[in-house]
Amino acid sequence: MSKIFRKFAKTEFIFRFNIIDHNVILYSLYLDIIPMDSSNNYKKKYKKYKRKYIDLKKQLNYNQIHNFYFVHSTTNFSNLRDILKSGVIYPGKFLRPDQQKLSVNSEDVFANIYFEDINNLTHLQDFSILLHPKIIYDCGMFFNKGWQGGGKGDIIINATDSPVQIAHKLNEIREFLKNPILPEKIREFNPFLHHEAFFNHPISLNNGNLIGIICNHCDGSFNDYITGETHKESLKIINNIINDKLYNNVKIITRNYPIPKLNELLH
């Protein structure tokens, strides 16, 4: 959790990234008064900076901030297993040929963004990695309308953006996902193809970034329709892999529907 301290005379403002209650991502400004004396000058400064605090809250418009997280889909159980072993999601160009699938020479890590209040995804893919929304504050994000395979990004969130800028861009993304303006043929496709979120660097599963693992029907025997392999005791395999990892307490979900809520994943 990062803190930026700004001192104004005898008043200290703590500008803090915080996740509260229902784990809604937001920024909050805490006013911490240090009563060094009781002079009128001090009281004036208190009132002045209290107004700044209230104004910032109004700018952020907290009621417009919604629960969301990222979904990185893998094509089969083997790829899911390899990611959990390494603890890192790598761009396609850094993977072995048998791992690359749709991202052969890509320098980006791709994902979908799921806003739970608009249910913009109908289900999750059979083998998926669920990522904490805080990663956009750590390293930014690119967003494309439709699945374009990377590029410059239709909407870019920089890690250096202000809280207000990030909130506005997230709201723009959410409004698009509520009613994607895309060619009709694309809109008929799986909602996973209506957009892409991507990152131009590997993503670590540590530091609380990994919040969930989807392994559909891994609590029993299943056939991988991509590889044709029959997998048994897959849940046990996953538990053994993550046993010595920092994310060993992450939730493993064995059905790809209903889609879990952020609050369920973090508690």
UniProtKB/Swiss-Prot annotation:
InterPro entries: DUF5846
Keywords: Coiled coil
Coiled-coil positions: 37-62
Protein name: Uncharacterized protein R11
